[in-house]
UniProtKB/Swiss-Prot annotation:
Residues 14-27 have a biased composition (Polar residues). The modification Phosphothreonine is found at residue 290. Keywords: Cell membrane, Cytoplasm, Guanine-nucleotide releasing factor, Membrane, Phosphoprotein. This is Guanine-nucleotide exchange factor YEL1. Guanine-nucleotide exchange factor for ARF3 required for localization of ARF3 to the bud neck and tip and involved in actin patch polarization. The modification Phosphoserine is found at residues 293, 299.
Amino acid sequence: MCASLNEVKKNDTYGVSQKGYNDNFSESEGVLHGSKSMPTSMKNMLQSPTMVNMCDILQNKEAANDEKPVIPTTDTATAGTGTEDISSTQSEETDQNSHLIASEILEGTFKDVSYKEYANFLGNDNNNQVLTEFVKLLSPLPSSLLETLFNLSKSIYFIAEAQNIDRILECLSIEWIACHPNTHWKSGYKSCHIVLFSLLILNSDLHNNFQVDHKKIKFSMVAFINNTLRALREENEYEELKIYSREHLIIEELSEYYKTLNETPLPLCTESRTSINISDNQSSLKRFSTLGSREFSTSNLRSVNSNSTTLYSRDGQVSVREMSAKSNKNFHNNHPMDALYLKESFDDGLITENGSSWFMDDLILISKKSLPRKYSKRDKDQVAAPKMTSKRNKSFFGWLKPSKTTTLIEHTSRRTSLSYLNKDSEWERVKIQVKEGRIFIFKIKPDVKDIIQSSETDSATIDYFKDISSSYFAYSLLEAEAHVVQDNIIIGSGAMKSNVCNKNTKRKSGNFTVSFPENINGPKLVLEFQTRSVEEAHKFMDCINFWAGRISPVPLTQFEAVSNAEYGWSDKILTEHASLNLKNIVVSEWKPLLGLELLYEDAKDVEMVELKERLKELMNFTRQLGIWIDKHNEIKDKLVEIWSFDDNYFEAVMNNWNSRYLYMNNQYKKRLSYLKALQKAMGSVQF
């Protein structure tokens, strides 16, 4: 038996009810994946960032809430007499009872619940002691995390609600660290928890027949490794315990796990305790933790999709996005706003055409969690709030760190675009206008019932909506990007009630997100919205991406500028490395250049070009960027060969290679979104 689990208090709580969904894929994005595939010779390092958030969970759409069985909990003995002896005796009896129940679950003889509900029973927050005893019975645990997961899957029917699975994996991680304290994971049970969760998702992805747009799309090895690594880097202990110093070992470990799991799926335990192949139970697998998309979207792990982002931003202090920036101040003070685009003759007839790529206006819903805190409680007459500052988490992906009161999944749903998966999500009415390079948001007061439906843009209409709003603000769409998150959303908290949509409508609601890149004023921001229909969500997406693409300059400087810094792949290194003393080389950290969009929210100083010219720029840029990505891929094997002599150099160079690849690939996909939106808009223009 390994060290006791009782030393770690488990007080996580959940409120997540998640449903399956299908993300949309453009034809061009599919081309990207095919043309940027992993070289067959690559075995250990990362290449493709085309993966999704580990906590996007697919569950059976047919499993209604009222059909879920009630999971009993174990009684907790209390000292009714208040005497120490009685309390001690009852505590011992409770421990014995928990051990007995755990043993019966392991043997498959526990009759209080169906064997298919064992995992839900163990993951119930009131049954922590039984869960602890059950995990102890699995000891000694194998030295491999994947083999440990195999043993768990053979011991229990491991299909359950996501939060219950998460609790079980956390408990298993604690026990594994107790059994194996001298590995490169050190005492980092949270990191092991992330790996176990990622492996479970990978298993479902590889062996579930879930399809996207009628095409079976599976994670590649590099997507799995990349997703897992970026989640690990966000966990505080990953840096505090210096686990990252052995990251090359972790990469090798994850690659072996992928190859093993790709060939041999996790077993599915049956009532008779004989295991069957998980791929034979596709209907049940829909409730497994799986992934709804293969895209690196706004609901993903934080992406590297702006000129301001670098993969390893581990230090420094930054401010929260300054909401009282120039456009917002002008909006609140009724001052004219600077033009963000070069106005052309055809614009006059389109900028007020609601439902077009030029203009969208409607009353919809916004996730309360995504509302800027500075404005969530502000009075409408407050013009400018004091600047807020906060320390950035030293590790890059802090959203994945479980807090003391929440576990991985619920924590993630608060920080990413997962509110539609949470039955307890709160949504508020907003009037949204997207026009001329900006998005205007009016948060309607709760007590306002009858709202005048008007899409006019005159000052009187704007003043009316300001009067009935508790807050209102504006964003420039420079470098922003919109995505429709799913086509079939089930949401709690009375989403889309009568004040927003017709009760008799049978159309399914749609959801879209708008992401604003990390800039000099603060971190990446994601706003989540719900519309009356999926069609309307797509219209908002097209309009936002049209304006973002029209006003955002093509970042050619990022790729054409020549730096004197050595990142590990200079021409001299690639051609003369055999004659160089590589240990004397100073390898710098690769970072994108500071782009102009980081300095100006209203970017009036950015060169404005005609729509046709911007479209031409985007077409040429995406074509050229594809070539640069291919060239960057081609040097990867050479870098492995050159820098393998030293772990520290190898890690630094490969981190640089991966950072640049992620940046290029995300720029590629963002510009493709812009290109698609501009091409669609051009179809309605007569030159």
